[in-house]
UniProtKB/Swiss-Prot annotation:
Listed name of the protein: G patch domain and ankyrin repeat-containing protein 1 homolog
Keywords: ANK repeat
Domain spans labelled G-patch: 263-309
Disulfide bonds: none
Skewed-composition ranges (Basic and acidic residues): 32-47
Region (Disordered): 32-57
């Protein structure tokens, strides 16, 4: 390894110019205070000059009034911005003002989404104690969720009258609407809470219930159509096409013969000409089958009559793969253990078969004609 020694050239310090001395940096002391003092002196000089000019021009008194009013407003602003005093200053005129004491208010930022959801859930479940606890915490009574529902709407949707009454008495807005423009009454009627609506109007309106929230309608059951209909709409339902088609015994009802041929068919017209009617059976003597024969689909190995099965015309729908699916699937050996087990079973069967035809005396004599 090659090393080299490098030395700096000799410095001639004695040849330096005495005027070229090193620069020394000194930290400033009280420069800011001096500048502030100088600026304040300049401001006072400008104000004295302006006051002297205003006094000379005759507007000194007006200018002083403006300055005094500005100082009063500044004091009012400082007083209202003080967080320790709950007061509000109301200016009545140019020279007078009033101080009004404010009630302590709770900010909405103190409640999170969990509190809002708990408040709405308590209204939905009818939990009066939980509702009172949230009201004591000064929660906004008309707070809404993502869908625009308030606690009053949740209570009305479930028919919780006591909760809805408590919220309305504590100042809840009865005319609030959700994102679908539905109010408290509309939501209750939509959920079938007509008794709740009647009770609500009886309590708050002394029974002055509007026509939209009348007593629950009486429903009647139509056995032919298998539906419930309002009692005042029974005549409309009876005259409907659905009810007339289901009423087979009515005069002039459509025939239910099950024959899928029309009056234009030549065979149909020949049978009618011979005195046949749709209520009679087919054939020369009118005693034949008019409907398809109902059968029983047997898919097991149980004996006949062992099971009480229902006779049907159609046992499965179209494109139903389960109808042609084999219920018992043969097990195919897939693992090595199953293959070995199957091989041992086949060997055992072959061994037993050979043992039955072993080279015994009786078998030998039989095949050689000695018996």
């Amino acid at each position: 390894m090659i090393t080299t020694n490098y030395q700096l050239p000799p410095q001639k310090l004695g040849n330096l110019n005495p005027e070229q001395v090193p620069v020394e940096f000194v930290r400033a002391k009280n420069v800011g205070d001096a500048e502030k003092t100088e600026m304040s002196q300049k401001r006072d000089d400008v104000q004295r000059a302006s006051n002297s000019s205003i006094n000379d021009s005759g507007f000194g008194s007006e200018y002083r009034k403006v300055i005094e009013k500005a100082k009063i407003r500044e004091k009012k602003k400082i007083k209202t911005e003080n967080p320790q005093e709950d007061a509000e200053i109301i200016i009545l005129d140019d020279d007078d003002f009033a101080i009004v004491k404010n009630e302590p208010s709770t900010s909405h930022s103190n409640f999170n989404v969990r509190d809002v959801n708990g408040f709405l859930k308590a209204a939905k479940d009818g939990n009066l104690e939980e509702i009172k606890r949230y009201l004591e915490k000064k929660i906004p009574i008309d707070v809404t969720d993502f869908y625009g529902w308030t606690a009053t709407m949740c209570a009305a949707g479930e028919g919780n009258f006591e909760v809805c009454k408590l919220l309305l008495e504590h100042g809840a807005d009865p005319g609030v609407r959700d994102s679908h423009s539905l109010g408290i009454v509309q939501i209750a009627q939509k959920n079938g809470k007509n008794y709740f609506v009647k009770r609500l109007f009886d309590y708050f309106c002394n029974g002055d219930t509007p026509s939209t929230s009348s007593e629950p309608e009486t429903l009647t059951f139509c056995e032919l159509c298998d539906v419930f209909i309002p009692k005042n709409a029974s005549s409309t339902h009876i005259s409907s096409i659905t009810h007339q088609l289901n009423d087979r015994n009515a005069p002039g009802a459509a025939p239910q013969s099950g024959i899928q041929i029309g009056p234009s068919n030549i065979g149909y017209r020949l049978m009618c000409a011979s005195g046949w009617t749709e209520e009679q059976g087919l054939g020369r003597n009118s005693d034949g089958q008019r409907f398809p024969i109902r059968t029983i689909l047997k898919r097991n190995r149980a004996g006949l009559g062992a099971e009480k099965l229902v006779k049907k015309v159609t046992h499965f729908g179209p494109f139903d793969r389960n109808a042609v699916k084999n219920l018992k699937v043969a097990k195919v050996p897939t693992t090595k253990k199953d293959i070995i087990k199957q091989k041992l079973k086949e060997d055992r069967i072959a061994k037993n078969f050979r043992a039955d035809f072993a080279d015994s005396d009786s078998v030998y004599d039989y095949f050689h004609g000695k018996c």
